[in-house]
UniProtKB/Swiss-Prot annotation:
Comp. bias intervals (Polar residues): 626-648, 822-838
Ranges of biased composition (kind: Basic and acidic residues): 655-666
Role, per record: Catalytic subunit of the poly(A)-nuclease (PAN) deadenylation complex, one of two cytoplasmic mRNA deadenylases involved in general and miRNA-mediated mRNA turnover. PAN specifically shortens poly(A) tails of RNA and the activity is stimulated by poly(A)-binding protein (PABP). PAN deadenylation is followed by rapid degradation of the shortened mRNA tails by the CCR4-NOT complex.
Gene Ontology CC: one annotated term: nucleus
E.C. number(s) listed in UniProt: 3.1.13.4
Gene encoding the protein: PAN2
SUPFAM superfamilies associated with the record: Cysteine proteinases, Ribonuclease H-like, WD40 repeat-like
CDD domains (UniProt xref): PAN2_exo (cd06143)
Compartment(s): Cytoplasm, P-body; Nucleus
Catalytic activity: Exonucleolytic cleavage of poly(A) to 5'-AMP
Full protein name: PAN2-PAN3 deadenylation complex catalytic subunit PAN2
Cofactor: a divalent metal cation
């Protein structure tokens, strides 16, 4: 037997407090070891045996803070420090239910009821049924730091904690019935008997309270310092806690025993462990279980104190602290929860299969799923009828049974006989025969399209709304979704020029939420907006306006062969909470997305977001003096005849709280966005009973088309102007609260337009069948006359005698596989009728103004779709007498949804103005003023103006329309040209010696306001000083490291090769730049670790040197900064004209999402490359030419950048000595010998 000291007093051990255990042959080391392996450490035969421990749910992250046996069923409940609750069935610890009760709070206590389980956290009380469904969650201002709870009756519960309130809670009404003040010490332990409620605080005091009134009856002082736990059984109250010893706080080895009859302290009980928790065994009234924080358990008998036997056990807590324990009502099992996340259970020796309760009810489990017969997937003879349907409980047939009228036999439609065959047919009895006119091909059956759809023959197949045999719709190639094919070199082998023959740069659609590419192109080609966003700059980290400016700068400089990515914009977009609330952020698992509603909501969101961001960045400037409120789409939707539920509760009172006034002051100011897209309106609410009138001004950024709901005549025609007018201004009756009447009263609400915008943004709606049916009817009315004319022209043509075999290209007769002879095809013409003319319901131009009565008047061109050019239509303005603020609007851009039967995508058709062509191509003044293009991600093609207003509503549906004020073109042209001139002056030439003064220098700002952070890891970093700012032509060596956000997705082809479906999504983690010349050559001046809020799948530590936690602002010791600020530094270096030296810089700049001209890049991977041979790694180049070994364990971007600079200097030396060719040859020969691996020695 060894006697070792088990106390926590490090200064000295009391001689009369010893711990005894049988150590066997192991020598005593003088202190308790938590990793002790023995279970029974007592002197007698064990009364309990240890069962197999289990790792609780979330145990790898959180400890088990509470365990409780169910009083009604054979279940053990567990709550952890992460707010998660799990139940286990019987001693086999089979998981039964698992659910989250709070996102972050610790589960402090668990109690079971007949109807479920109660889980108490720091600030809430959750009630859930045992199957995991929540019943209620109660929160109160009085619940600040709850610790324990106790059920006094089936419908009464008391809760307390480290606060001065004790809460009496009614489980039936879910209300607090009484609040008792318990003092500053709070109440951490609650117990009860038949007379009192015992409440123990952390100062060592136990208060005896009345069970009904909760008033204080008696007070007992247990320990001198802190009360740890106590238990009540019969007339005894036994406690454990902390006492002062030698001016230190130590665990008291004596259990204080109080007789509740006399309220006096009797003889204490000495234990051999450090008691932390204790509890009476329910079935044995005199036996007590005492538990230490190390997992030691001692069973103490309060009656037979003179008995020499010691019953002690050691629970395997994996070297961690024991946090909770509980005893079953049958005393056959005990459960312990520790900090390592494990649950240990011990069972009585007499009952190795313990029962938690003597009389437990059965636990409800899920119904067993019936097993279906196993059938081979290749068995084509298996009858499906052998799988029996469930028995019908009611009725005689299933709801899925088809009605009898749909079960008739329908045969294939017979092929119609050519009238020419019938006219030449001769009869011989019942049989007729005729010579073959050869006007039709073999094995063809005509398919007659049902009437009611908008479909007409078209020369280039644009109007073909039919479907192929496999169900895929036949649509033009330029509208189809183009899949980007990846190889082992990424997108370097992909020919983008095949899909883009223009001078414009496209956008890749490989990242999530790339559905907005169509809208991004429209915003870019809106000249006034592009100019404002290129000038915008603010200090907000995730500013969408700044990111749009960066993206527009890339689109200005990129070409068709180098499409851009909106990765940085989408990264900031995912962080905006409003975008997530509107459902605009999609994941890879998103399916069946309504793209029409999605892109319209995105249009409304981005306009309002830019408005708020530009206002925040310029709030110190002059503000708009009027009281203007930027309205949302819900306000514009109020112009519809169908008012939402919110309209019933509109109030005509303008009294608002101070918080609303502060919020309105933010959106009332006029910004550059509201000047471009804003339509000023006034909303007049007039109470019908008291004639009280309230007027509210607002600005509408996006207009929703409001279609009629109830039409008396189905053939009634509504033109576009009528629909637009009723959408902008309306009058209706609603139920609203009147302040004068003090009740809801009928109210007339009218909306009027007071000012027109420069750019009119229109959401077309069409997200339901009702609106689509209405628009189809209007489109059919427009095409009726054209269809009649086409039929007349076709009837006058005579069929060719040679039919399909005719080889003459100038034949004037009709052929079954050719157009009519009067048709003249044009390369990009989109014709909806044989004579090359189309009429559309959507006009290319219209005139809108405000008359003397303040009403909006919209006049559309009667020949808007008559085939005239857009320039001719704009010059022929209709008479607009009597109109104020009269403006001519021309269609600027359209967003369409394209559905080919297998997938849907969004495309945009944009009228690119002449100033942009001049900027890109430097065209002469004699060139056309504008040209229409279709933008389908990186596929861009020119189209005719008619195609922008041509829709089938089958596979091509309009989503958003943008109309521009025609008279603003001159202003836009001058603004754009001046912007181009400024941008050209901003980029210095190679001969310039100084940096431009009109560029914002972030390096100077860093000198004035140095970045805060831990610079211990950046001892070699020396920021740029004011006298060493980079100039045009200066060398800067750069390297970047990346982490993976989404892994790569591959598939195995039938030939066994692996194909990349989706590339991995990389994010920049570290950017390092070093000086390339001067006295400080090779010294880094920029070494930024990029903070990220997104989940990182793989840190790629072996290749990047980035470790978990380096990018987290809460734990990182690195020089963390936001991506936007590092991006601004790189952008400044690019604009100044520095030359970057690096290894694989093209991929680095692609992930960083910045465009760098090729003449500003020196890439060592290409310098030391022999044509038609492999690329050489930086590590091998450094070893071969410089004799240094790098990247031995992990990569370091500063080391890599410095190495590339040295390699470039060595390259210049070899070129000067004319030894480079031989050196390159030796490099590849040596690499092949060593298999391109650096030797270890």
């Amino acid at each position: 037997m060894d006697y070792v000291y088990c106390g926590t007093d490090p200064i000295g051990a009391s001689e009369d407090i010893l711990s005894v255990y049988d150590a066997g042959s192991a020598p005593g080391n003088g202190h308790f070891s938590p990793s002790f392996n023995g279970f029974n450490i007592g002197t007698t035969d064990p009364e309990y045996v240890e069962l197999v421990p289990v790792l609780a749910d979330g145990g790898e992250h959180f400890g088990v803070s509470s365990v409780a046996f169910d009083d009604y069923e054979e279940l053990l409940w567990m709550g952890n420090q992460g707010g998660h609750v799990t139940s286990y069935y019987t001693n086999s610890m089979q998981k039964y239910t698992s659910f989250q009760v709070h996102a972050t709070d610790i589960v402090r206590d668990i109690s079971t009821l007949d109807s479920g389980v109660l889980a108490l956290t720091q600030t809430s009380l959750r009630h859930q049924i045992r199957r995991g469904l929540p019943k209620f969650t109660f929160k109160s201002n009085n619940m600040k730091e709850m610790v324990s709870m106790l059920q006094l009756s089936p419908h009464r519960l008391v809760m307390a904690g480290l606060q001065d309130e004790l809460i009496d809670f009614d489980l039936r009404t879910l209300k607090e019935t009484r609040i008792e003040h318990v003092g500053a010490g709070g109440c951490t332990v609650l117990r009860k008997n038949s007379r009192y409620l015992f409440a123990g605080d952390q100062l060592g005091t136990v208060t005896l309270r009345d069970l009904n009134s909760l008033s204080v009856q008696h007070t007992i002082k247990t320990h001198t310092n802190i009360l740890s736990d106590f238990s009540v059984q019969g007339n005894l109250l036994i406690s454990c806690g902390y006492s002062g010893r030698q001016n230190n706080l130590a665990i008291d080895r004596f259990l204080m025993v109080y007789d509740l009859r006399m309220l006096r302290l009797i003889a204490p009980i000495q234990v051999m462990i450090d008691p932390q928790m204790l509890k009476f065994l329910p079935s044995l009234t005199s036996q007590l279980a005492v538990v230490s924080s190390y997992g030691q358990v001692q069973l103490v008998d309060t009656v037979e104190l003179s008995e020499p036997r010691v019953s002690m056990y050691q629970i395997n807590t994996n070297g961690s602290q024991c946090l909770s324990f509980d005893i079953s009502s049958s005393s056959q099992a005990m459960a312990f929860g520790d900090q390592s996340g494990h649950i240990n259970m011990i069972a009585a020796v007499q009952t190795p299969q313990p029962q938690f309760n003597l009389y437990s009810r059965s636990t409800e489990f899920a119904d067993v799923v019936p097993q279906l017969p196993m059938v081979s997937i290749t068995d084509t003879n298996f009858p499906l009828s052998s799988v029996m349907l469930p028995h019908l409980t009611t009725g005689t047939q299933w709801f899925s049974d088809w009605p009898e009228e749909l079960l008739r036999y329908r045969y294939h439609r017979p092929k119609t006989i050519d009238p020419e065959v019938l006219s030449n047919m001769k009869m011989q009895g019942p049989i007729g025969y005729s010579p073959n006119p050869r006007t039709a091909r073999r094995n063809q059956i005509p398919y007659v399209i049902e009437q009611g759809g908008v479909c007409s023959p078209n020369g280039n197949g644009t109007a073909a709304a039919t479907k192929a045999e496999n169900g895929v719709k036949i649509i033009p190639r330029r509208y189809r979704k183009v899949e980007l094919k990846y190889t082992k070199l990424g997108t370097q082998d992909f020919d983008f020029d095949q899909h883009n023959q223009t001078c414009f740069a496209g956008l890749e659609a490989t990242l999530p939420n790339s559905y907005c590419n169509a809208m991004l192109q429209i915003l870019y080609f809106t000249d006034a907006l592009r100019v404002k966003l290129l000038e915008h700059s603010c200090i907000k980290e995730f500013c969408l306006s700044c990111e749009l400016g960066f993206l527009f700068n890339m689109l200005d400089k990129s070409t068709a062969s180098s499409p851009c990515q909106a990765s940085n914009f989408l990264r900031s977009f995912r962080t905006v909470p409003e975008a997530s609330a509107l459902g605009l952020i999609l994941t890879d698992r998103s399916s069946n997305v309504n793209l029409i509603s999605l892109i319209q909501n995105w249009n409304r969101f981005i306009l309002h977001q830019m408005h708020y961001e530009i206002f925040d960045s310029s709030k110190n400037a002059s503000t708009y003096s009027g009281s203007v409120q930027t309205s949302t789409n819900a306000e514009n939707a109020g112009s519809s005849e169908t008012s939402g539920s919110s309209d019933l509760y509109d109030s005509i009172s303008d009294e608002n709280s101070k918080e609303d006034d502060r919020e309105r002051s933010k959106i009332n100011a006029e910004t550059d966005i509201s000047k471009i897209f804003g339509t000023k309106q006034i909303c007049i609410n007039r109470c019908i009973k008291c004639q009280e009138e309230k007027i509210k001004e607002s600005i509408l950024l996006a207009c929703n088309l409001s279609y009629p709901n109830h039409i008396k005549d189905s053939d009634q025609y509504f033109n576009f102007g009528t629909i637009l007018k009723r959408s902008l201004s309306s009058e209706k009756s609603i139920q609203a609260f009147c302040e004068r009447c003090k009740k809801f009263s009928p109210t007339n609400q009218s909306v009027k337009v007071t000012s027109l915008p420069q750019i009119l943004s229109i959401n077309c709606g069409l997200n339901n069948e009702k609106d689509i049916t209405f628009l189809k009817r209007q489109l059919n009315r427009c095409s009726e006359k054209t269809t009649v004319d086409a039929a007349a022209s076709l009837s006058t043509s005579k069929p060719c005698r040679y039919g399909a075999n005719c080889s003459r290209s100038d034949c004037h007769f009709m052929h079954p596989d050719r157009k009519s002879p009067s048709h003249t095809s044009q390369p990009n013409a989109v014709n909806n009728s044989p004579n090359g003319r189309q009429k559309s319901w959507f006009p290319l131009t219209f005139t809108m103004g405000i008359n003397d009565q303040g009403e909006v008047q919209v006049q559309t061109q009667s020949d808007a779709s008559s085939g005239k050019s857009e320039q001719e239509e704009e010059t022929e303005k209709p008479p607009t007498k009597g109109l104020d603020n009269n403006r001519m609007y021309a269609l600027h851009a359209v967003v369409c949804q394209v559905d080919d039967g297998t997938q849907k995508n969004l495309v945009s058709l944009i009228n690119v103005q002449r100033p942009y062509h001049t900027m890109k191509l430097a065209e002469s003044a004699d060139d056309p003023q504008s040209q229409w293009y279709i933008f389908n991600d990186f596929s861009i093609s020119p189209v005719s103006p008619q195609e922008s207003v041509w829709f089938t509503l089958d596979w091509k549906v309009p989503c958003i329309l943008f109309y521009r004020h025609v008279e603003d073109d001159s202003e836009s042209a001058s603004t754009t040209s001046s912007t181009v001139t400024e941008s050209e002056e901003t980029i210095p030439s190679e001969s310039s010696s100084g940096s431009p003064t009109n560029l914002s220098n972030p390096f100077l700002e860093e000198i004035v306001s140095p970045m805060l952070g831990n610079l211990s890891a950046d001892a070699t970093l020396q920021p740029l000083q004011s006298d060493e700012m980079p100039q045009s032509g200066d060398l800067v060596a750069m390297d970047a490291e990346f982490v993976t956000l989404n892994p790569e997705e591959n598939e195995i082809r039938p030939d066994g090769k692996t194909a990349t479906i989706k590339p991995c999504h990389m994010s920049v983690a570290r950017i390092s730049c070093i000086r390339g010349q001067g006295p400080a050559e090779g010294v880094p001046f920029m070494d930024d670790y990029i903070s990220t809020q997104e989940k990182v799948v793989d840190y790629l530590t072996q290749f990047s040197g980035i470790k978990p936690g380096d990018l987290d602002a809460n734990f990182s010791k690195k020089r963390l900064t936001a991506l936007k600020y590092s991006y601004q530094k790189l952008k400044y270096l690019v604009d100044v004209g520095v030359i970057f030296v690096g290894h694989g810089l093209k991929n680095d700049f692609r992930v960083i999402n910045i465009y760098v001209p090729s003449e500003q890049i020196i890439d060592t991977v290409h310098l030391f490359h022999m044509p038609h041979h492999r690329m050489v790694s930086l590590r091998f180049l450094a070893w071969h030419f410089l004799g240094t070994k790098i990247q031995s364990e992990t990569h370091d971007s500063i080391e890599d950048a410095r190495t590339t600079l040295q390699l470039y200097k060595h390259y210049l030396k070899l070129q000067e000595e004319k030894k480079f060719a031989n050196a390159l040859k030796n490099l590849y020969e040596r690499g092949k010998q060593l298999q391109w691996k650096v030797p270890e020695d």
